[in-house]
Amino acid sequence: MVKFTADELRRIMDYKHNIRNMSVIAHVDHGKSTLTDSLVAAAGIIAQEVAGDVRMTDTRADEAERGITIKSTGISLYYEMTDESLKSFTGARDGNEYLINLIDSPGHVDFSSEVTAALRITDGALVVVDCIEGVCVQTETVLRQALGERIRPVLTVNKMDRCFLELQVDGEEAYQTFSRVIENANVIMATYEDPLLGDVQVYPEKGTVAFSAGLHGWAFTLTNFAKMYASKFGVVESKMMERLWGENFFDPATRKWSGKNTGSPTCKRGFVQFCYEPIKQIIATCMNDQKDKLWPMLAKLGVSMKNDEKELMGKPLMKRVMQTWLPASTALLEMMIFHLPSPHTAQRYRVENLYEGPLDDQYANAIRNCDPNGPLMLYVSKMIPASDKGRFFAFGRVFAGKVSTGMKVRIMGPNYIPGEKKDLYTKSVQRTVIWMGKRQETVEDVPCGNTVAMVGLDQFITKNATLTNEKEVDAHPIRAMKFSVSPVVRVAVQCKVASDLPKLVEGLKRLAKSDPMVVCTMEESGEHIVAGAGELHLEICLKDLQDDFMGGAEIIKSDPVVSFRETVCDRSTRTVMSKSPNKHNRLYMEARPMEEGLAEAIDDGRIGPRDDPKIRSKILAEEFGWDKDLAKKIWAFGPETTGPNMVVDMCKGVQYLNEIKDSVVAGFQWASKEGPLAEENMRGICFEVCDVVLHSDAIHRGGGQVIPTARRVIYASQITAKPRLLEPVYMVEIQAPEGALGGIYSVLNQKRGHVFEEMQRPGTPLYNIKAYLPVVESFGFSSQLRAATSGQAFPQCVFDHWEMMSSDPLEPGTQASVLVADIRKRKGLKEAMTPLSEFEDKL
């Protein structure tokens, strides 16, 4: 095998046509890490014999122990193509050597933020789908994320060995199963028609679908078989490819192809006849140890085995034979090289997704052309904890220019605004490193189009940042990432020994760096809160916190707490008025719920404060039935200027209105961050400023007078508009055999869940159940479910939506009012809610 050095890798890094940056994405347990192993083995990093069992990219102890991937891990692979195989390659290339930067990402939904970070710095994705389970919820979520980032997918149908060994399906049935899986994936991809990307769907007959068995380390695309038969029958390779998939049948008796099954017993579909049956035959021969038949068959295929390998029996024999005949690495790496874009191609169409500034300045042009001599543009997508405790590598991708050891860079954080000093640092890179699985190799410099890890920047980057070098023209940062899940589960942590407090504070800072999604905050009552995407995610984070970031100091954690949101379900019963502290200014306001779907549109970023007001008012008028003029009078969104609440100006001819606009908005940001019920964020409320009466002297209507008044009037208008609590709801997908359905339903009913879809997977005994489950009830759900179904059901929870609670929090004794009292008690507020009379004034 090739053992390559860092210098060789560095040489290929300059050939930007020969680089492929790709991530491996899939549903949990569909075999990503196992498949990645075969690729790593081909590059000579681990031995072929153990591939499939090592899971090289699961570098953490708890990953190996749980058998799941938690963090996304990068590896650089070197691969040399033969001239023969490159004959049909039409794109630009420099020589035969290729560099593949591969990132193995987690499939478990709690870690989907890791996937987002991986996707940002790659251009192509290998989507792994289990041939029997098919396209699952998480496959769909991740695929949509990838297409949203304009990443070109190729598909592999994995766990083929199950078809031959476990289920013993016959050819036609297998073909139907595979074609259904591919069709389901294409349905998702078809919704992303992008003129720049072209057609993103995958087709076996074009070579963009592979069939693999990660555990046994073999895989094929139809290209492999087409090549083999083309020389044998003397037909053109491309013609043979088309015949190996779809409605093409071959009858060996008459030696003719036809478009439909002629009904004769020997007539079979092309795929079955030429791909499926030969594999099935060889596997059967190996498993039955009929070696006298096996060697002549292999000789025909041109496969030679070493003498010691001929001694093997049963499964090990089959594994070696299949690996020698159809090595997974060759099939998959060739598919990536042929069908995934190089950085040079990809950055042309990705630049508008990546760059925030004008698309014609020098930085955008450097990204578009992937120019190594242009200005540096580098996006850090995550921080990786180094082996010496407390230090981090900044891991990211160079989009333009070069990054080298000792170079001075400008670090632009997520809140940086061009032309201002906020969130901007200048620092030099201590050294640049490339990642090769468990070890790192230091290199002098890394040119654009590659992934890189840097040492020495960890004090200045929290989660992600953009790096550029010093230039006269300020660069705009690269867009921040959008996560598909939100941190809704929180725990309070404290130290067992009070003297460990400084360790805890330091540890929380490091934890916030190491995970792209965790939010660590400190409440006013002084407790430290850690928020994550779900139970498993939090568990892993707290384990990291205790073992890695606090040096093993013990921590106590509270029961998990769920964030709620506050909303209203009706228009205010009357217009409420509040007076300023000096009694000279009066604000009149009403609250009303937003239209259906508007809050979600703001969350997704389709409507936001930075949009062009003309476009925004058009969307609001057409989709949500707003008045055209009203849509132009939105003052602000909140909380944090982008949240799903807004203030709209409904005043007619009021003097000095513009002077107090900023103060009202400031009061609104404050109020929408902590509502009157339990100081939780507001959601989906539209506040209308009806009238304002102001003092004529400017000194009596300053911010100190208006801001608290605005906050009080907002609270009063919310309380008069039938306030309600919103609770977060998971969508749970459960796969289970029919016998386990009863247990699933009973557990869901205890937990206030309800099933909204149940379907049987065609061709399998499994049922797919989708249900809604309130996050509050989800703790311990998976262990209860496994107990009730004796381990046959496997749940996946994804945050889905906010559900309004039907009970009224203002009436004592209802479920909502008990919840409000609990939250207030936990936050150290008075248990009784502040009455309306405190917020509303009489004339």
UniProtKB/Swiss-Prot annotation:
Q: What is its EC number?
A: 3.6.5.-
Similarity section? Belongs to the TRAFAC class translation factor GTPase superfamily. Classic translation factor GTPase family.
Fetch the Pfam families from UniProt.
Answer: EFG_C, EFG_III, EFG_IV, GTP_EFTU, GTP_EFTU_D2
Name of this chain's protein: Elongation factor 2
The protein's matches in SUPFAM superfamilies, at most eight in alphabetical order, are given as: EF-G C-terminal domain-like, P-loop containing nucleoside triphosphate hydrolases, Ribosomal protein S5 domain 2-like, Translation proteins
Q: Which NCBIfam families match?
A: small_GTP
Subcellular location(s) per record: Cytoplasm
Organism, per UniProt?
A: Arabidopsis thaliana (Mouse-ear cress)
Protein role: Catalyzes the GTP-dependent ribosomal translocation step during translation elongation. During this step, the ribosome changes from the pre-translocational (PRE) to the post-translocational (POST) state as the newly formed A-site-bound peptidyl-tRNA and P-site-bound deacylated tRNA move to the P and E sites, respectively. Catalyzes the coordinated movement of the two tRNA molecules, the mRNA and conformational changes in the ribosome. Involved in cold responses leading to freezing tolerance via the induction of cold-responsive genes.
One GO cellular component this record assigns the protein to is: plasma membrane
* Cysteine disulfide partners in this protein: none
